[in-house]
């Protein structure tokens, strides 16, 4: 699949029509009324253009960060050409009419520059412009499926109008071509990535396989699919096959942009020692009986693939760790080495376990090992992808992997990183944590 970034945008303004001229994107004035009218549950909407000099602006909780991309011609996700706008992202924020944040187990409201972990796969990069829409949904629907769904669907009105403009641009606007290839490597160790996504209902849901990258049209909610495993290609993942609705704790939330830049998928694709055959998305139901029903489907699906090893990842922590552990068990009991990746540390410590959970990678970056409500802080990054691949290779080779300590010890991570660096002869760049950000009032009062 080709990604063709249109000229990096320097400015975004509101004007009479939505269009792109040179390095400037114009968004139609009055489009807010159409966003509100699109969904009965949307009661108010405000559109802001946030430039880098305005990062110290108050915002309600960030529900999602999305790339702006569209398919060329009749191309479908994972194939053909995709046009991408660089230098700008869509950002959805919101509350209900009572002022309650659309989030659960924490929220990221506050000054943007104090509550975003810049550069995380799912977060904005410093220097980008935010097309930020703040939606107000009907009171008390913030914790129902229909509230967040209405917010995301209405906000996509603006993104889709931009996509339609992008389709009409001539090739002079293309400044860079990036080719993404999914190369199979017969004879190498075949591996699969299982990504557990939220599916408990209420706000915990995702749209899968829309027509447009991170779009709405044509997508199916994984809750409506029964949360059963859905197999996709690595390129479908990187082309925006997941529109994330989940509003779990901000620090471990995988936003739509996270899948667009999914680090483990990218690391496995580029690793010449493994053969990445695909990615399996599986929802996390609310009821335990449904969790085990779905988990058995995961085990059979992975067994049918005849893989040599597997990864199981999850966002969030707590309830979803029940099926996270069960996925690992169902794969492991079939004689397949499996590495689990999750935020654990102190606050996300696993509530369940089994004998197959011997190969684990912790996504924690926070200083205290907690959900600190800083967007993206504890999400899977390249460094976890590198560690997980090294661990799975060791497991597939039958090498010893030491048992985890009973209590969280951040030195385990640094020791493993040093071992991998010594073996591979290259430096692993570790990302910053919340200590690199200006101190927010919330962090000062609650965490630090």
Segments predicted by a language model, with ranges:
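Short glycine-rich or small-residue beta-strand-to-loop segments that form or flank ligand, phosphate
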Residues: 51, 193-194, 308-315, 339-342
């Amino acid at each position: 699949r080709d990604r063709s970034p249109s000229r990096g945008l320097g400015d975004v303004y509101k004007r009479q029509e939505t269009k792109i001229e040179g390095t400037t994107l114009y968004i139609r004035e009055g489009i807010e009324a159409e966003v509100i009218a699109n969904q009965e549950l949307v009661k108010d909407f405000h559109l802001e253009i946030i430039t880098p000099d305005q990062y110290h602006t108050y915002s309600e909780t960030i529900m999602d960060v999305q790339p702006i991309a569209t398919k060329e011609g009749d191309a479908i996700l994972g194939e053909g050409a995709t046009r991408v706008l660089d230098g700008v992202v869509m950002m959805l924020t919101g509350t209900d009419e009572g002022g309650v944040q659309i989030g659960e187990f924490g929220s990221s409201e506050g000054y943007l520059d104090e509550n975003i972990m810049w550069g995380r796969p799912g977060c904005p990069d410093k220097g980008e412009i935010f097309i930020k829409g703040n939606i107000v949904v009907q009171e008390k629907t913030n914790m129902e499926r229909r509230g967040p769904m209405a917010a995301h669907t209405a906000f996509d009105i603006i993104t889709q109008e931009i996509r339609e403009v992008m389709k009409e641009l001539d090739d002079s606007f293309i400044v860079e071509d990036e080719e993404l290839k999914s190369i199979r490597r017969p004879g190498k160790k075949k591996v699969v990535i299982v990504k557990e996504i939220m599916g408990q209902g209420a706000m915990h849901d995702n749209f899968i396989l829309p027509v447009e990258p991170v779009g709405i049209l044509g997508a199916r909610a994984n809750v409506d699919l029964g949360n059963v495993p859905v197999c996709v290609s690595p390129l479908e993942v990187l082309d925006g096959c997941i529109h994330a609705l989940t509003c779990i704790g901000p620090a471990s939330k995988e936003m739509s942009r996270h899948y667009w830049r999914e680090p483990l998928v990218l690391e496995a694709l580029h690793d010449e020692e493994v053969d990445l055959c695909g990615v399996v998305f599986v929802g996390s139901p609310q009821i335990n009986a449904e969790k085990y029903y779905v988990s058995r489907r995961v085990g059979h699906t992975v067994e049918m693939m005849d893989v040599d090893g597997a990864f199981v990842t999850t966002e969030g922590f707590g309830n979803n760790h029940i099926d996270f552990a069960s996925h690992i068990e169902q794969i492991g009991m079939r004689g397949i080495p499996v590495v689990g990746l999750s935020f654990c540390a102190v606050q996300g410590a696993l509530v369940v376990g089994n004998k197959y959970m011997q190969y684990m990678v912790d996504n924690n970056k926070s200083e205290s090992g907690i959900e600190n409500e800083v967007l993206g802080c504890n999400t899977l990054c390249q460094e976890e992808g590198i560690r997980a691949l090294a661990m799975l290779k060791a497991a597939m080779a039958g090498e010893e992997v030491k048992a985890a300590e009973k209590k969280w010890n951040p030195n385990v991570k640094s020791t493993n990183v040093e071992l991998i660096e010594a073996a591979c002869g290259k430096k692993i760049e570790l990302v910053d944590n919340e200590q690199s950000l200006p101190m927010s009032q919330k962090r000062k009062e609650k965490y630090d």
